[in-house]
């Protein structure tokens, strides 16, 4: 996550779960470590271009434990209102398809938003509106 701060009202409360269009968002947290790891690793080559060009995340040898630590960090940042990461599902919640990250930025924007879906669900990317 970049240094900086998201400009939020003092009393802001981010929804932990919400429906947006045909999708359901839920806080990204450690209870989904195994499925998140599977989806991340199956899509790792494309994911290395999402946050910055030729990123090293996720590493070829990333472990389940490292993934769990990432999810613990995302949950902590969410609770501290530093950043907001959501897991993304279709409305029926039958399949975890990706993530949305709302991160602080040093640029003159309120935040940076990143979205990714698994390679197997890439066709759904254009249907998610945030």
Predicted regions and their residues:
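GNAT-family acyltransferases
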Residues: 1-120
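Conserved small/polar residues in nucleotide/adenosyl-binding loops
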Residues: 128-130
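Phosphate/ribose-recognition catalytic cores of enzymes acting on nucleotide-derived substrates
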Residues: 125
